[in-house]
């Protein structure tokens, strides 16, 4: 068996990725999120596949087909809510995974980091298109508002929006193409995940100290397979708690009304995991400026490898940078809260201040703190 594991062309790849992979001996539970995301992705693809068997991508029947899944299909309600809450779980894990990468300086593996950013964008696109599919009120208006942002692009904007819609509004053509893209994108995500892992295994994992760990490596199996199973249990428990006790906790009540183009909901907002970016978009009074800020809020991640000025890789021994990272975390929580609030007096100002602080912290304060910490080291 050992011989086969190490010699068979296909099993050899699995062996080098999950069994005999040399892993730093000191990585903490923060390194569990990659495997948790993998499990989450598999769950999303499986539940999505079963949902696609019963769903119809047509404006007249989409809403009732989702109702049919919940009422008449065996365990349809479970599959539907696992899929919907699985997306929330996916984003919680992604954000924690990115936060870990920033804290421990994992972004210095620039290829792995950049593919990670592509993955984030692909997952966001997939989640957005999936949210449109039930053709509820918030689905319809969310799709209308977000796709309409492209009309801010000079000269070609309006044509581009109508081309994406396949008509003059979000209609059957839009739903059909969104379903097609929502189905194919997860497989593209799987390919990107493989590339992400390929580049990661070229360099080996980072570790909490941020130092080279070549002198102290242990095999991935059994040490980290066992450790990951603990993570799977926690994640499984959390998602089942959500699905079985409060499946609509993170959803929007408006989405239980069928889409009605003649009736606009009082507060149009996306799912909770996009609210921080939505708040940044809304805090700029200009349409094109808002779209640019929205893109910048995600793409600013690509600047981390170039903005790393510290002599230390990890933030473990950098108190000023640590404080700034927690300021950034609180800032994102405030943006998420603001994104879900109506556009009126105190919220507009809070949103603008939080948006400004977000970019200020990442682009100016973090590099400055790195330089200050380098100076302190010399003293």
Swiss-Prot record:
Report residues binding heme b b562: 83, 182
Topology in the membrane? Answer: Multi-pass membrane protein
Q: What's an example GO cellular component term for this entry?
A: mitochondrial inner membrane
Q: Where does a ubiquinone bind?
A: 201
* Recorded superkingdom: Eukaryota
Cofactor(s) named in the record: heme b
The keyword tRNA processing is annotated on this UniProt entry: no
* Transmembrane region(s): 33-53, 77-98, 113-133, 178-198, 226-246, 288-308, 320-340, 347-367
Q: Which GO terms describe its molecular function?
A: metal ion binding; ubiquinol-cytochrome-c reductase activity
List, alphabetically, the InterPro entries matched: Cyt_b/b6_C, Cyt_b/b6_C_sf, Cyt_b/b6_N, Cytb/b6-like_sf, Cytochrome_b, Cytochrome_b_C_euk/bac, Cytochrome_b_N_euk/bac, Di-haem_cyt_TM
Q: Which Pfam families match?
A: Cytochrom_B_C, Cytochrome_B
Record note on cofactor: Binds 2 heme b groups non-covalently.
What are the recorded Gene Ontology BP terms? mitochondrial electron transport, ubiquinol to cytochrome c
Q: Name the residues that bind heme b b566.
A: 97, 196
Question: Which of UniProt's keywords are assigned here?
Answer: Electron transport, Heme, Iron, Membrane, Metal-binding, Mitochondrion, Mitochondrion inner membrane, Respiratory chain, Transmembrane, Transmembrane helix, Transport, Ubiquinone
Xref: Gene3D superfamilies: Cytochrome Bc1 Complex, Chain C
Record flagged with keyword Disulfide bond: no
Q: Which CDD domains match?
A: cytochrome_b_C, Cytochrome_b_N
Its subcellular locations are: Mitochondrion inner membrane
Question: What family, per the record?
Answer: Belongs to the cytochrome b family.
User: Which PANTHER family does its entry note?
Assistant: CYTOCHROME B (PTHR19271:SF16)
Its job: Component of the ubiquinol-cytochrome c reductase complex (complex III or cytochrome b-c1 complex) that is part of the mitochondrial respiratory chain. The b-c1 complex mediates electron transfer from ubiquinol to cytochrome c. Contributes to the generation of a proton gradient across the mitochondrial membrane that is then used for ATP synthesis.
Subunit structure and binding partners = The cytochrome bc1 complex contains 11 subunits: 3 respiratory subunits (MT-CYB, CYC1 and UQCRFS1), 2 core proteins (UQCRC1 and UQCRC2) and 6 low-molecular weight proteins (UQCRH/QCR6, UQCRB/QCR7, UQCRQ/QCR8, UQCR10/QCR9, UQCR11/QCR10 and a cleavage product of UQCRFS1). This cytochrome bc1 complex then forms a dimer.
The record's misc note reads: Heme 1 (or BL or b562) is low-potential and absorbs at about 562 nm, and heme 2 (or BH or b566) is high-potential and absorbs at about 566 nm.
**Protein name per UniProt:** Cytochrome b
């Amino acid at each position: 068996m050992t011989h086969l594991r190490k010699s068979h062309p296909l099993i050899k790849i699995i062996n080098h990725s999950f069994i005999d992979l040399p892993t730093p001996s000191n990585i903490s539970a923060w390194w569990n999120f990659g495997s948790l995301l993998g499990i989450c992705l598999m769950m999303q693809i499986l539940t999505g596949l079963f949902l696609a068997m019963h769903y119809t991508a047509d404006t007249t029947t989409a809403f009732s087909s989702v109702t049919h899944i919940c009422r008449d299909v065996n365990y349809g309600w479970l599959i539907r809510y696992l899929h919907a809450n699985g997306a929330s779980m996916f984003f919680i894990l992604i954000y924690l995974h990115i936060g870990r990468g920033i804290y421990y300086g994992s972004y210095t593996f620039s290829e792995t980091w950049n593919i990670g950013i592509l993955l984030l964008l692909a997952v966001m696109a997939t989640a957005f298109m999936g949210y449109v599919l039930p053709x509820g009120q918030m689905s319809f208006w969310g799709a209308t508002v977000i796709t309409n942002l492209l009309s801010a692009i000079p000269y070609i904007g309006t044509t581009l929006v109508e081309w994406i819609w396949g008509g003059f509004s979000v209609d059957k053509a839009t739903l059909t193409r969104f379903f097609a893209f929502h189905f194919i994108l997860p497989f593209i995500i799987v390919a990107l995940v493989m590339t992400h892992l390929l580049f990661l295994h070229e360099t080996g994992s980072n570790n909490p100290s941020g130092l080279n760990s070549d002198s102290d490596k242990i095999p991935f199996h059994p040490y980290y397979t066992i450790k990951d199973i603990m993570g799977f249990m926690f994640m499984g428990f959390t998602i089942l708690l959500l699905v079985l006790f409060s499946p609509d906790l993170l959803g929007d009540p408006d989405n239980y009304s069928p889409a009605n183009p003649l009736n606009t909901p009082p507060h149009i907002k996306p799912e909770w995991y996009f609210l921080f970016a939505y708040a940044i978009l809304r805090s700029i009074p200009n349409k094109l400026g808002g779209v640019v800020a929205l893109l910048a809020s995600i793409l600013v991640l690509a600047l981390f490898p170039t903005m790393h000025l510290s002599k230390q890789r990890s933030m473990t021994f950098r108190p000023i940078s640590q404080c700034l990272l927690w300021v950034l975390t609180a800032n994102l929580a405030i943006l998420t809260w603001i994104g879900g609030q109506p556009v009126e007096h105190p919220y507009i100002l809070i949103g603008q201040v939080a948006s400004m602080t977000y970019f200020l912290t990442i682009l100016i304060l973090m590099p400055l703190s790195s330089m200050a910490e380098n100076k302190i080291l010399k003293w």
